[in-house]
């Protein structure tokens, strides 16, 4: 009876000894990783360079004589230059590939025919090189995109209408001396009333309204300055040279301008801006020409003697009327909004040229030669 328990004891003791041996064997194994962790924790990883990955890639590409590198060459440059990229951490390679592929300032060059597979060359976009001049490695200047978006509409309008050629020294303060216009005299279909906010500071006297009429009347004559009250004919002196005829000027029923009496006086008594405005006023007092067969719908026929043709700056000798006046009916078939919009642009450019070509004591004229043969485009 006692031998049975004695036989069972050795396996139990052996098992216990085995277990104890197993526990002794696990102690150094468990202590090994802990010591390794402690040793790794004591060694600090090199500090990351104080540059963005875009800046690091640009440094690598600019260091090459050919200004282009492959991905592996960029890796080699970074590892040789900065100790941070020589350690066991390999996540920076993903960041380099990410910035190369997603940033528009880097371009992947196409490979040759005999080089299949990987190994594309990377270079800097020539349009983005200015962002990295003088050590500036930011993507773009702060607020650069917002400023471009804010200034783009104004620049496009200024360049389209030629307002950038009007310096502030050419004042038009006296241009509204004899013309008093109601606020709604500029009947515009679009948003041309916004031009009042972008004109130079001295163009306030032109009496451009800050708002526009959304729809043009479909019947009847309408004009930009149809409601302007012209001054008396005797208030304006006669200019020495006659104004060149233009298809933008209103004419009589026959299509030819009638000569008027010569008024005595000197053009030197008027300031340059006022005299230039008198010449250009002929283009501004442009009423929409209607068909000659419908004189009742055209209020211009009854008001020419009181508004525009009585004024001496519209004086025209009969021998100076060119043949282009016969081309006026070509404007009749156009839509009212298209004709008025085109003629407004032409009139403003003509006024700008007249103010810049004005002489001190001579006559003042505006060049209409450029616009005489231009037909308004029908959109």
Curated annotation (Swiss-Prot):
- List every stretch annotated Disordered: 1-45
CDD domains, per database record? FH_FOXF1
Its GO biological process annotations read: animal organ morphogenesis; blood vessel development; cardiac left ventricle morphogenesis; cell-cell adhesion; cellular response to cytokine stimulus; detection of wounding; determination of left/right symmetry; digestive tract development
Localized where?
Answer: Nucleus
Record carries keyword Protein transport: no
Provide the function of this protein. Answer: Probable transcription activator for a number of lung-specific genes.
Q: Give the comment on domains.
A: Activation domains C-terminal of (and distinct from) the forkhead domains are necessary for transcriptional activation.
**This chain belongs to which protein, by name?**
Forkhead box protein F1
**Name of the gene this protein is made from:** FOXF1
